Swiss-Prot record:
GO MF terms held by the record: metal ion binding; protein serine/threonine phosphatase activity
EC number of the protein: 3.1.3.16
PPM-type phosphatase domain span: 48-356
Taxonomy, superkingdom: Eukaryota
Keywords, sorted A to Z: Hydrolase, Magnesium, Manganese, Metal-binding, Protein phosphatase
Entry-linked SMART domains: PP2Cc (SM00332)
CDD domains the UniProt entry points to: PP2Cc
InterPro entries: PP2C, PP2C_BS, PPM-type-like_dom_sf, PPM-type_phosphatase-like_dom
Reactions mediated catalytically: O-phospho-L-seryl-[protein] + H2O = L-seryl-[protein] + phosphate; O-phospho-L-threonyl-[protein] + H2O = L-threonyl-[protein] + phosphate
Protein name: Probable protein phosphatase 2C 28
Binding locations of Mn(2+) 1: 87-88
Organism per entry: Oryza sativa subsp. japonica
Amino acid sequence: MLAAVMDYFRSCWGPRSPAGHRVRGSDVAGRQDGLLWYKDAGQLVTGEFSMAVVQANNLLEDQSQVESGALSMAEPGPQGTFIGVYDGHGGPETARFINDHMFHHLRRFATEHKCMSTDVIRKAFQATEEGFLSLVSKQWSLKPQIAAVGSCCLVGVICSGTLYVANLGDSRAVLGRFVKSTGEVVATQLSSEHNACYEEVRQELQASHPDDPQIVVLKHNVWRVKGLIQISRSIGDVYLKRPEYNREPLHSKFRLRETFKRPILSSEPAIAVHQIQPNDHFVIFASDGLWEHLSNQEAVDLVQNNPRNGIARRLVKVAMQEAAKKREMRYSDLKKIDRGVRRHFHDDITVIVVFLDSNAISKANWSRGPSVSLRGGGVTLPANSLAPFSTPTVLSSTY
């Protein structure tokens, strides 16, 4: 029985090679310490990386992946690195779905186009959204709550000396760039955010829905789309995109009183294209759980002023220390709080730091390098779980 359980955990979180084979070994797959999962250091075809995930929700709603090597199915084809951070809400289903499908779609479209481009990335987002909509359609009658599950989606692709950053929601990618004149490493945000707390997002929503004075509502001092959700773009959240799912048997707290004729939320990603320069040192990809507690420059300073090995774990720790400070409690006490209850203090946090090696990036264009396929981990519960069901306990851990 124990062997079967361990096989299940390995199947959920073990890394795969591009051919689909699992790579065994705790160092390769990352390590678990209480609610913290981490991979302190690893080598990509474009440089080094560090990765960490800490769980706060009863069900881990953050999903993440690092893929490095072939970016298409063609031989020869473009080589590079793919980063994905998927911050789910309402449950883990959408984020898990993106983790299973986004990179596959990207490789498929890169094969068709014979290159990497914004069109390839946009089509991968669209195919992932359509795939999840199809899943909702199949499961709606038995599991209507799945229509109210969604995810932010942050993707980074490094290929042929270019960094593409595509985003839906409020995860963030921040570049650390060395400024020769001052000797400082300065933070530059590469991603656009889609959260109603920003005036420009509210204006965009109002322009798209001029006949709806309640398209954004200030509720308990927080701006929300239709009074329900803070983000304006996502994968999933079908109940705010297709009116046929905004009805019974969906729970009444998600249903709008009035019907709608066009989607309220969008799945169109904002895509930035950045030509990598020698003074571009690293990029921090993280869910909003990190950015709630650290500014862009604070995060960049931490990466710049500390060893690469374990830097993602260090960022998570500093964010948790800030969360504890805000609640006037000790970090050591916060670590003892189990998933579920922990969400009252901080969100799930995912951090992936990618160091940009100009030499490796130039060599990786079409030549084979080390292949990496890794997914962020956590305390896993059954894949079909929609609702928390365990009693929180006190944990002991060393991070």
